Regions:
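Bacterial Sec-dependent N-terminal signal peptides
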Residues: 1-29
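Extended hydrophobic/Leu-rich segments
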Residues: 10, 14, 51, 118-121, ...
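Flexible, surface-exposed loop/linker segments and immediately adjacent secondary-structure boundaries
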Residues: 23-48, 54, 68-138, 142, ...
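Short, surface-exposed linear segments at secondary-structure transitions and domain or protein termini
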Residues: 51, 55, 83-88, 175-181, ...
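N-terminal beta-strand/beta-hairpin edge segment
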Residues: 53, 60-65
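Beta-strand-enriched, solvent-exposed domains that form extended recognition/catalytic surfaces
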Residues: 120-226
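Short beta-strand elements
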Residues: 207-280
């Protein structure tokens, strides 16, 4: 009897493992281009991939973001660059490159929508990647920590075409403005992408010509319309799970932090609240 019981347990485990291995992935975003190797069709948001499917990327840097059947979040990206004479290596099997995200702790550390003002710009921007939804974010800072006026200002320092660029952030009383148009247009040329790498943040005092570096990070501006469409792809998936609106909002914010990095807490909360509450 014991042997029979053990065989049943092993059988059930094998079935469970088989089902898990066959878990499908719903594409939510594609960076670059990706093609279904078997059908020859270009992948798009909403397409479903099976573990055994093969995908061909247009470049090594392209990747796919997806959600699995059990609501896990996955990135599919090549692990190693192909050799120049082996472009066929841009074709991979889904199960070999689907990697679950591991950045939920970032949201736990950085998502603080209840904060009325920022007392630590290093903690706010971080030292890795900071994203802005749309083209502008307003940052109310603590006047005790950062007294912004005609003498004390916040400056972004970065490089464009290998030339140094310094940009003073606009402000109104103690509210700072990070504005895409003003940062992208420089005397050294206009930045065509949505990212400015290695942005150093300084508190600069004009009278004494002294500066203090606060932090350094990669700044990314996220297209609001594209993000809206991406979340609209995800919403029906979550609703099919009978999730409440509050749980859906939490999931979308976690998703954002997983794949876009840290952002302004009030901005992402307002964006998700409006999207979920107004969605039909």
């Amino acid at each position: 009897m014991k042997t029979k019981f053990n065989l049943i347990v092993v059988f059930l485990i094998m079935i469970g493992s088989s089902l898990l291995a066959q878990e499908s992935y719903i594409v939510t975003r594609i960076n670059g281009k990706a093609m279904n190797y078997k059908t020859g069709t270009q992948l798009k948001a909403g397409d479903v991939l099976q573990p055994a499917d093969r995908v061909t990327f247009d470049t090594f840097d392209s990747y796919i973001i997806s959600i699995s059947q059990n609501m896990g979040r996955f990135m599919m990206k090549m692990h190693e660059p192909p050799s120049p004479d082996a472009l066929q290596q841009l074709t991979v099997t889904v199960k070999d490159v689907a990697v679950p995200t591991k950045r939920r702790s970032l949201m736990a550390e950085r998502y603080k929508p209840e904060e009325s003002e920022i007392s630590d710009l290093k903690g706010y921007f971080g030292s890795d990647k900071f994203s802005v939804i749309g083209s502008k974010v307003s940052i109310p800072v603590n006047p005790t920590t950062y007294k912004i006026d005609d003498n004390k200002i916040i400056v972004f320092y970065y490089r464009v075409n290998n030339n140094p660029v310094s940009k003073q952030l606009g402000y109104d009383q103690n509210v700072l403005f990070v504005e895409k148009d003003k940062l992208m247009a420089t005397n050294s040329g206009t930045i065509a992408s949505n990212e400015i790498p290695s942005v150093a943040v300084y508190l600069y005092e004009k009278n004494t010509r002294t500066s203090e570096e606060i932090t350094k990070f990669d700044l990314v501006f996220v297209d609001q319309e594209a993000l809206t469409n991406e979340f609209y792809t995800i919403l029906p998936i979550l609703r099919r799970q009978k999730m409440s609106n509050d749980d859906i909002k939490k999931y979308l914010i976690e998703y954002y932090f997983d794949f876009y990095g840290a952002t302004d807490s009030k901005s992402i909360k307002q964006f998700v609240d409006q999207l979920v509450d107004n969605a039909k």
